[in-house]
């Protein structure tokens, strides 16, 4: 069986699909069904850890090293993870295209790095590694500001690095442009009246609006969530809006510059039929009244080109459904459709050029991709007759069983638990 695809991103033309599976990046030409780009992260986790500790030990002063009874300096040993230590997975956590689609950015968990690729479709392999920039803490979210890549990490810091610069900077010399006291979950660069801002969301239900690039100046906070924030989405049809979601039963629709909460978009009643026992809290926190928990995995928006109606698409983690809403001119939100699938949806992307929603699935039958067409007359999606099985077969990662899968559902681990 094939390992599922974990992230999917399409270019604006809808011709190229960029996707990840384990530690492999693939670029697929959807018109020909051919693989046109590939990169595999060959980095060995143990080699990376060994290098890090060797650098640390080399800097130790011999005079400060412990002495044994014989008077000889003790040689520091490179530690190895003991029993019960959390595993370090070698996979790609985030994927993003530059605004001009000339670059592809990804994060690697193995060495806490961001990798930058140039995209050249005239070459046999359209991906060329430009730079691999390590960070002190693991990057978890990316945003783009023209010629700079904005990187948020799990420690709560945000960095800005030059896209065009090939030089790799020592991670200890990188200076954060802002910081949270909690783990960051998403980041977005926005503008208002030609002035730029950076929006950051974290595990502690905070959404912060800061000036950019002078991000030490905080404009305001957006208060409306009670659980973690996992998704920040600024729609192209109105960049004065922000749609946020995470561990709550609802999404928040904001006028972010004014700090105004315009609407709450309720999800529980709509997604409840697709919640299973896997959405219950871990056993040690489970009570008789524990609800099944919702975690927002992806938020997309687009505009019906025929009617001008703005559409919102929402994916909740580990569910076999996608929710469709309309947002009218008065910012009222109405549920339009629930798309149900046979298998859990892992990720999705919408291609406006072809009115196509592509979804990646956790499937034992190797039905790893599905696509739906948006009907501009009915404002609904319908399945296409074309299958993507041939495209899914380009997946190079074969596994024996689900036990060989990397963690596919981790967003809900952001949820804070009380021991009392």
From Swiss-Prot:
Main location: nucleus
Cited SMART domains: WD40 (SM00320)
BP GO terms, sorted: tRNA (guanine-N7)-methylation
Basic and acidic residues bias: start-end ranges: 59-68
UniProt entry tagged with the keyword Acetylation: no
Keyword RNA-binding appears in the UniProt entry: no
Gene Ontology terms for molecular function: enzyme activator activity
Pathway membership: tRNA modification; N(7)-methylguanine-tRNA biosynthesis
Location within or outside the cell: Nucleus
InterPro entries: Trm82, WD40/YVTN_repeat-like_dom_sf, WD40_repeat_dom_sf, WD40_rpt
Family: Belongs to the WD repeat TRM82 family.
Subunit structure: Forms a heterodimer with the catalytic subunit TRM8.
Listed PANTHER family: TRNA (GUANINE-N(7)-)-METHYLTRANSFERASE NON-CATALYTIC SUBUNIT WDR4, WD40 REPEAT PROTEIN 4
Name of the featured protein: tRNA (guanine-N(7)-)-methyltransferase non-catalytic subunit TRM82
This protein's encoding gene: TRM82
